[in-house]
Regions:
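Solvent-exposed alpha-helices and their adjacent loops that cap or buttress functional pockets
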Residues: 23-26, 57-63, 88-92, 98, ...
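Sparse, context-dependent recognition of short Cys/His-centered cofactor- or disulfide-binding micro-motifs
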Residues: 41, 54-55, 63, 83, ...
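Gly-rich Lys/Arg/Thr-decorated short loops/hinges at beta-loop-alpha junctions or inter-strand turns
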Residues: 34-36, 60-66, 156, 169
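Conformationally flexible catalytic loops at phosphate/diphosphate-handling active centers
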Residues: 93-169
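Short C-terminal domain-edge/linker segments immediately following a structured domain
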Residues: 37-39, 62-68, 100-102, 127-131
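General secondary-structure edge motif
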Residues: 4-5, 36, 65, 136, ...
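Thiamine diphosphate
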Residues: 1-58, 62, 68-90, 162-169
Length: 169
């Protein structure tokens, strides 16, 4: 429907969601994914950890894609980067990961919830129903013809270069 969407979990749950994250990337769909990392393999613990850094910054699933990753250093920054994450996901039509850890997940502090202006981006990808007024909109992540897939992968890497140039914090 074109609405903003978010999901969250911690390390093992993100691993279980990795196939869906890959599909989001393959369909060029915006989403915010919050990963409150756990330390160690398996279920891990809630101690401070950067154990999912490689998974987050190198794709979080199979295929030729990357996530845009935001890493807050405070609870206020977690709030601010949540708003920014939604905006970046829509701007670049891709999944964005907010990467935190168990310590941050347990912290409490006063925060300001100033969302600011919400930029409206093109949502021609949205599945809003046709109302018998237009052709159906199909969102696809499967491209059987190698030439089509190659073109899409190159477009994706051009997008990553644009992000690298424009979004360094």
């Amino acid at each position: 429907t074109g609405k903003r969407v978010m999901t969250s979990s911690s390390s093992p749950g993100i691993s279980l969601k990795s196939e869906g994250i890959s599909y989001l990337a393959g369909c060029d769909l915006p989403a915010l994914i919050v990963n409150v990392q756990r330390g160690g393999p398996g279920l891990g613990g809630i101690q401070p950890s950067q154990s999912d850094y490689m998974q987050a910054t190198r794709g979080a699933g199979h295929g030729d894609f990357h996530l845009l990753v935001l890493a807050p250093a405070s609870v206020q920054e977690m709030v601010n980067l949540t708003f920014k994450g939604f905006d970046l996901a829509e701007k670049y039509r891709m999944p964005v990961m907010l990467l935190s850890d168990g310590t941050m997940g347990q912290m409490m502090e006063p925060v300001s919830l100033d969302m600011g202006e919400i930029t409206q981006y093109d949502k021609s990808w949205a599945l809003t129903g046709t109302g018998l007024k237009r052709e159906p909109n199909v969102v696809n992540s499967l491209y059987i013809k190698p030439d089509e897939l190659e073109v899409l992968n190159f477009k994706r890497y051009e997008k990553y270069a644009q992000i690298k140039e424009n979004e360094q914090m």
